[in-house]
Amino acid sequence: MKRPTSSSRKSKKQGEDLAFSEEGSLPAVTMEQKDEAEMEEVDDEEEEEVDEDMAGGHAAQSPSPSCGLGEKKRRLALEQVRALERSFDTDNKLDPDRKARIARDLGLQPRQVAVWFQNRRARWKTKQLERDFAALRAQHNDALRADCDALRRDKDALAAEIRELREKLPTKPADTAASVKVEAGNDAAAGAAAATVCKDGSSDDSDSSVVFNDEASPYSGAAFIGFGPSFLVDDASAATVGCSSSLPALESKWHGPYSDDSCKGGVYGFTEEWLAACSGEMAGNDAAGFFSDEHASNLNFGWCASGNEGWE
C-alpha cells in the first residue's frame, strides 16, 4: 500500500469542510473573518470599560481576569474626568475637530473621548427626564390639591344651603295640613247637618202609607198657630203673644179626628164653623183672601182618620 501524501491530506480536509458547510447550510468561516470578529469584540469591551473606570486615580494598566490573552484595561485619571466634565458642560455635542483637540490635550485617544461623551449624554438625558418628571408630578399634585380644596368648599356651601332649605320646609306643610283638616271638618259638619235635615223632614220610603209627624207636618196644629188677628200685628213681640194667645182658641176648636161622614163636609180635624170664624175675623185684612171661598175649596183633603178611603 502507498502512504497518503500531504496533497491528499489537504484535499481530504477541504472536502470535509465543504461537506460540513453543505450539511449545516452555513458558509465556511475563513481565518480572516475570525480575526475581524475578534477585533470587533475587543473594541466593544474597551468602550464599556472606559466609562466604568473613569474615576480612577491615574492611568493604570491591569490584566483582564476574563481574558486569557492578558489584554490591558485603560482607566481615566481624575483630572481627565474633570476636564471632560467641563467640556461637556460647555457643549455636549462633539465634532471631529473638538474631539481631536480634547484627546490631544488630555493624552487620550479620540475614540475614548467619543465614547465618554456618548455615555455622558445618555446619563444626562436620564437625569433630565427624572427632573422633568418630578416637576410635572409636583405641578400635578398642586393642581389636584387646589381642585380638591375648591370642591370641598363647594360641598360645604351646598350642604349649608340644604340645611337651610330643610329648616324652612317643615313650616309650610304643617300650615297646609292644618288648613286641610279645618276644611275637612267643616265639610263633615255640613254633611252631618244635611243628613239630619233629610232624616227629620223627609221620608225615604215614598211607596209607603202617608204618615206625618204632628210637629213636622205642615198641616199639624202647630203650623196653624197664629192665624188669628193678633198674628198680623207688625211687632214681633205682639206676634209672639198672638201665637201664644191663639193656642187656647185652637184647642177649643180642635175636636180631633172625625168619622168618615164628617170628613165629607170639611177638612181633616177642623169644622166649618171654625173656618168661618177665622175668615170673618180676618175679613178686613189683606191676608183674608187666603181663606176666601174660592181658596177654601183647596183645603178640602180627601183622606179620613182611618186612611182607608181615597180622594173624593
UniProtKB/Swiss-Prot annotation:
- Chief localisation class: nucleus
- Species name: Oryza sativa subsp. indica
SUPFAM superfamilies associated with the record: Homeodomain-like
Keyword Hydrolase belongs to the record: no
Q: Which InterPro entries does this one have?
A: HD, HDZip_class_I_plant, Homeobox_CS, Homeodomain-like_sf, HTH_motif, Leu_zip_homeo
Which terms does the record give in the GO molecular function aspect? DNA-binding transcription factor activity, RNA polymerase II-specific; sequence-specific DNA binding
Which PROSITE patterns does the annotation name? Answer: HOMEOBOX_1, HOMEOBOX_2
Pfam family name, one: HALZ
Record-given protein name? Homeobox-leucine zipper protein HOX13
Q: In which tissues is it expressed?
A: Expressed in seedlings, roots, stems, leaf sheaths and blades and panicles.
Q: Which Gene3D superfamilies match?
A: Homeodomain-like (1.10.10.60)
